[in-house]
Amino acid sequence: MDRHLDKIFLRGLVVHTRIGPCGKAALTSLEADLEVAIDLSFAVSSDKLSDTANYSDLARAISDVLMSSRHPNLGEAASAAAEAVLSTEQKVCEVLLTLRNSRVVLKGPVDQIGVSVRKCRR
């Protein structure tokens, strides 16, 4: 995420979804962090909200994808959510989306597992 673009971020969006083998039986809470690369120069000079990305729309795009169907794994879920952000907001050039799951059972002391995906507009 360089290209000298500005960044907008959302941190700690919690979404309840069905994911992985355990998702057949119960909902899992995932935490999402989003960072988007966007040119904010028009928004700064115009002072119009329509010249920037809508935070609510970004959060809704992620939530809708994660809640709409059961995902086989974190990587697929993150990829689908990142693509939804690009589809929702045409001003966004690049998306970095991280999904974390803190309700995981692994051998050894692990607080969370997660995945980050980066998607670029073509």
Q: Model segments located where?
A:
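N-terminal, polar/charged subdomain of small-to-medium soluble alpha/beta proteins
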Residues: 1-122
